[in-house]
UniProtKB/Swiss-Prot annotation:
Lineage top rank: taxon: Eukaryota
InterPro entries tied to this protein: bZIP, bZIP_Maf, bZIP_sf, NFE2-like, TF_DNA-bd_sf
Location of the region described as Mediates interaction with CHD6 and is necessary to activate transcription in the Swiss-Prot/TrEMBL record: 591-596
GO biological process: aflatoxin catabolic process; cell redox homeostasis; cellular response to angiotensin; cellular response to copper ion; cellular response to fluid shear stress; cellular response to glucose starvation; cellular response to hydrogen peroxide; cellular response to hypoxia
Keywords: Acetylation, Activator, Cytoplasm, Disease variant, DNA-binding, Glycation, Glycoprotein, Host-virus interaction, Nucleus, Phosphoprotein, Transcription, Transcription regulation, Ubl conjugation
Name of the protein in its database record: Nuclear factor erythroid 2-related factor 2
Designated gene of the protein: NFE2L2
Segments of this protein annotated with the region Leucine-zipper: 522-529
GO molecular function term, any single one: molecular condensate scaffold activity
Chain ranges of the bZIP domain: 497-560
Subcellular location: Cytoplasm, Cytosol; Nucleus
Motif ETGE motif per record, residues: 79-82
Biased composition (Basic and acidic residues): 416-430
């Protein structure tokens, strides 16, 4: 045989290519081009696709490396969960000032940031627990004077004001203490350069300045030269939009409280009593007692003002005093709008709100009874006699036994006029909702309430002026219905509506009858099922009794069998063995002693 050279299995032969060329010329609509059958062309496309895939993988790898390098420069914030750039350790530069209260600290550059262990070691080296470096108690007592007992709260010294010559001379410290202070500043610089403490964002200007206190030999009268720490500079941004008149009144009243001739007037009772006052009324009392100096030109004495302030903060709060506050002022419409429907027991000499019921318990119980009803049922209850409550006058409820008097004659007159208007309101007028100022228009309410109970067929029959009721159209027999229809003349629309009403009514009645029959059948089946269950229980009970009696009979029979078998004897007078013999009874009633057949023993090979 001749060996034929076969082309590789993956490559088409020349004969196949010629056949494909012939077929393509005969039918161009093969759906594919000739390049598809060209293996070299397909191989080039495969190599090109492979190169694109490798290039794509290379780009993805490069992007992953860039992301890895980018995230290496970030740190995760544990509080917010976002990535933040790692900030290098920045050294805090201290500001230099000409004042004696500020110390000059030179900037110490650091090549590497200190960590916590290095910092602790540096602290141990700087402040060793040795008696040589400790300051003696006498030196400490000479530097730190005793604070007078009448000054309970710490008083800060204003650093932006010039000090007296005696104070500046008294603040001169020994040389060794200056060196220790510089060491402390240097340690603070190194502490704040730790990366773990960068999140604190502590600056030198926010740190508490350490100032020297004059020795006890200085006169106690120098307290008058000090200026108490005022909260006005910190409030300049908040009260910047206020008028100068208000700021002047604030400064006068605040300075009159603090700038006293005798420091003993700053008692603990007056300083700490503001802790017992509710913070909700802080701004109200604040505006109340600072407005007095602006009204009168004469300033009260410091002792009287301190005594009145302590009484105001420690004494019981009167309801009439609260009416001065803006939250209880009747002249503010925004505050009165919030308490239109208030159920509070405190009466502030204001008229009852028209929008709310006279008693909240009555309104809540009335609303609960109407909660599960439909709109039509609610309207029926509204229209029923006795359902509308009579708005009689009621005595207002107060928290105290005395009546609260109005603050001014004009204000009291306005409230009395408003009460008179509320009493003269007609009783038949419906209560309005909180968003309305007038009573709703109720002219057509009765007719709409009646139409709400009509069905769709009744409304259509009423619109076409059909003189017969819908129930009569549906329920009349055929003869009576035809006789009724012959007595009247109807147009096509009326006839079509009457037929439609009767047809749908009959269908409805038929459906109701069908459902009724189905329900009756279901009830009958339930009764049959209950009867079968009772019969089953009865049969099971009888079966149990029969089984019990049968078991008793078997027991009696076995007892009789053993008794008869024990009475039998052989020729020798010996009893028969029950394992070898048995008693059997024939149909005629005779009993025979039959030996039991023994099975022959089969030996297994």
């Amino acid at each position: 045989m001749m060996d034929l050279e076969l082309p590789p299995p993956g490559l088409p032969s020349q004969q196949d290519m010629d056949l494909i060329d012939i077929l393509w010329r005969q039918d161009i609509d093969l759906g594919v081009s000739r390049e598809v059958f060209d293996f070299s062309q397909r191989r080039k496309e495969y190599e090109l696709e492979k190169q694109k895939k490798l290039e794509k993988e290379r780009q993805e790898q490069l992007q992953k490396e860039q992301e890895k390098a980018f995230f290496a420069q970030l740190q995760l914030d544990e509080e917010t969960g976002e990535f933040l750039p790692i900030q290098p350790a920045q050294h805090i530069q201290s500001e230099t000032s000409g004042s004696a209260n500020y110390s000059q600290v030179a900037h110490i550059p650091k090549s590497d940031a200190l960590y916590f262990d290095d910092c602790m070691q540096l602290l141990a080296q700087t402040f060793p627990f040795v008696d040589d470096n400790e300051v003696s108690s006498a030196t400490f007592q000479s530097l730190v004077p005793d604070i007078p007992g009448h000054i309970e709260s710490p008083v800060f010294i204003a650093t932006n004001q010039a000090q007296s010559p005696e104070t500046s001379v008294a603040q001169v410290a020994p040389v060794d203490l200056d060196g220790m202070q510089q060491d402390i500043e240097q340690v603070w610089e190194e502490l704040l350069s730790i990366p773990e403490l960068q999140c604190l964002n502590i600056e030198n200007d926010k740190l508490v300045e350490t100032t020297m206190v004059p020795s006890p030999e200085a006169k106690l009268t120098e307290v008058d030269n000090y200026h108490f720490y005022s909260s006005i500079p910190s409030m300049e941004k908040e009260v910047g939009n206020c008028s100068p008149h208000f700021l002047n009144a604030f400064e006068d009243s605040f300075s009159s409280i603090l700038s006293t001739e005798d420091p003993n007037q700053l008692t603990v009772n007056s300083l700490n009593s503001d802790a017992t006052v509710n913070t909700d009324f802080g701004d109200e009392f604040y505006s109340a007692f600072i407005a007095e100096p602006s009204i009168s030109n004469s300033m009260p004495s410091p002792a009287t003002l301190s005594h009145s302030l302590s009484e105001l903060l420690n004494g019981p709060i009167d309801v009439s005093d609260l009416s001065l506050c803006k939250a209880f002022n009747q002249n503010h419409p925004e505050s009165t709008a919030e308490f239109n429907d208030s159920d509070s027991g405190i009466s502030l000499n204001t008229s009852p709100s028209v929008a709310s019921p006279e008693h909240s318990v009555e309104s809540s119980s009335y609303g609960d009874t109407l909660l599960g009803l439909s709109d039509s049922e609610v309207e029926e209850l509204d229209s029923a006699p006795g359902s509308v409550k009579q708005n009689g006058p009621k005595t207002p409820v107060h928290s105290s036994g005395d009546m609260v008097q109005p603050l001014s004659p004009s204000q009291g007159q306005s409230t009395h006029v408003h009460d008179a208007q509320c009493e003269n309101t007609p009783e038949k007028e419906l209560p309005v909702s909180p968003g309305h100022r007038k009573t709703p228009f109720t002219k057509d309410k009765h007719s709409s309430r009646l139409e709400a109970h009509l069905t769709r067929d009744e409304l259509r029959a009423k619109a076409l002026h059909i003189p017969f009721p819908v129930e009569k159209i549906i329920n009349l027999p055929v003869v009576d219905f035809n006789e009724m229809m012959s007595k009247e003349q109807f147009n096509e629309a009326q006839l079509a509506l009457i037929r439609d009403i009767r047809r749908r009514g009959k269908n409805k009645v038929a459906a109701q009858n069908c459902r009724k029959r189905k329900l009756e059948n279901i009830v009958e089946l339930e009764q049959d099922l209950d009867h079968l269950k009772d019969e089953k229980e009865k049969l099971l009970k009888e079966k149990g009794e029969n089984d019990k009696s049968l078991h008793l009979l078997k027991k009696q029979l076995s007892t009789l069998y053993l008794e008869v078998f024990s009475m039998l004897r052989d020729e020798d007078g010996k009893p028969y063995s029950p394992s070898e013999y048995s008693l059997q009874q024939t149909r005629d009633g005779n009993v025979f002693l039959v030996p039991k057949s023994k099975k022959p023993d089969v030996k297994k090979n």
